[in-house]
């Protein structure tokens, strides 16, 4: 690994932890708050994972701790892992109260995703617009005075844009290329905005392209442009964006399941584990839009935490809820040993899955290099 690569990871990993730790703590705070409101005894709220480094505070029943492994946090409830005689134990709470406490972490992560996307939509309101990536020598674009970085606002009055938070929407550069190609050999009215924000209206005669030439003679890319936002529109974008992000995450999880079942020796497309996410963070922070993209990445990660924890797979919250329901239906004694085995197997499978994803992350990072 080169020196630049070492600096890349030394920068990326701490930033990822600064994103993930608050998201996990928000999740755990949901469990903590609802447990308190439900009258369930909370023994410990920990930042990081044991071994314990320091007790940073306590009240009449809860110890607040700082732990040595800085990878999240946890809430320890009386009677969560085993039966307890304490009437305020989690194991003695009614099923509805247990389910509310388990669902609170997912709910907090969903709300966090919406809030972060709201901030992105209101403060930045990022829009994707087709842009000029490069200009070919002797092309109609060069003759018209186009430069790299210019925004292609419209062709014959027709423009192509999309909201960055509209996940899954078509890249606006594609219909722009198609429109230019459809008008090859014709004179079109082209509206262009330069990097200073000045717009020009140009009459440009497009060529009939040969080989790798384009009709205009530019490499059409996509630029992120900030536009004025308002809170009402931002709220709609935030809710819609979170919903669409959940849909894409669900599709990705389905693709991973299919990949594992059919060809586990190949990397799952479009899916990253901790190493891949750290690499993405490292790439994002070097971009001009780094702060906005980090906020958006945090929102997507929060939505991802919510959806993954909702899955009915022990030891995730959804799996715990499923076990609670089974215990209610069949009785605690009938599923006691099975519950322990289920958690152990589920945890082992979860760790194996993370290791599997991370293996391909490391391979990709090693071949591409930061």
Report the location of each language-model feature.
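PDZ peptide-recognition modules
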Residues: 2-12, 81-96, 104, 108-269, ...
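Alpha-helical transmembrane segments of multi-pass membrane proteins
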Residues: 20-24, 109, 113, 300-309, ...
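Membrane-interface alpha-helices at helix entry/exit sites of multi-pass transporters
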Residues: 333-341
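C-terminal transmembrane module of polytopic alpha-helical membrane proteins
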Residues: 358-370
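Transmembrane alpha-helix interface/packing and boundary motifs in multi-pass membrane proteins
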Residues: 261-264, 285, 301-316
């Amino acid at each position: 690994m080169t020196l630049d690569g070492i600096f890349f990871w030394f920068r990326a990993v701490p930033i990822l932890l600064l994103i993930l730790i608050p998201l996990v703590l928000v999740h755990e705070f949901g469990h903590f708050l609802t447990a308190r409101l439900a009258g369930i005894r909370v023994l410990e709220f920990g930042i990081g994972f044991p071994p314990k480094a320091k007790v940073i505070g306590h009240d009449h029943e809860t110890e607040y701790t700082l732990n040595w492994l800085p990878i999240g946090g946890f809430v320890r409830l009386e009677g969560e892992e085993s039966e307890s005689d304490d009437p305020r134990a989690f194991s003695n709470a009614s099923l509805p109260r247990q389910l509310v406490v388990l669902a609170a972490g997912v709910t907090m992560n969903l709300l966090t995703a919406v809030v972060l996307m709201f901030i992105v939509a209101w403060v930045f309101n990022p829009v994707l617009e087709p842009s000029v990536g490069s200009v070919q020598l002797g092309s109609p674009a060069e003759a018209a005075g186009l430069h790299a970085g210019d925004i292609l606002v419209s062709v014959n009055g027709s423009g192509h844009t999309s909201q960055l938070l509209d996940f899954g929407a078509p890249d606006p550069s594609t219909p722009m290329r198609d429109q230019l190609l459809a008008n090859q050999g014709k004179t079109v009215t082209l509206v262009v905005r330069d990097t200073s924000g000045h717009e020009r209206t140009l009459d440009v005669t497009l060529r009939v392209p040969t080989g790798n030439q384009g009709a205009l003679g530019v490499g059409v890319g996509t630029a992120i442009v900030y536009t004025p936002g308002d809170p009402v529109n931002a709220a709609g974008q935030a809710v819609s964006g979170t919903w669409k992000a959940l849909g894409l995450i669900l599709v990705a999880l389905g693709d991973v399941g299919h990949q594992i079942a059919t060809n586990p020796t190949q990397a799952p497309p479009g899916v990253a584990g901790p190493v891949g996410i750290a690499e993405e963070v490292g790439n994002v922070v070097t971009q001009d839009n780094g702060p906005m993209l980090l906020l958006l990445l945090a929102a997507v990660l929060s939505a991802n935490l919510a959806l993954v924890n909702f899955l009915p797979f022990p030891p995730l919250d959804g799996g715990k809820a499923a076990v609670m329901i089974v215990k209610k239906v069949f009785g605690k004694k009938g599923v006691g040993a099975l519950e322990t085995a289920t958690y152990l197997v589920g945890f082992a499978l979860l760790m194996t899955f993370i290791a599997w994803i991370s293996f391909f992350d490391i391979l990709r990072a090693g071949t591409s290099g930061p």
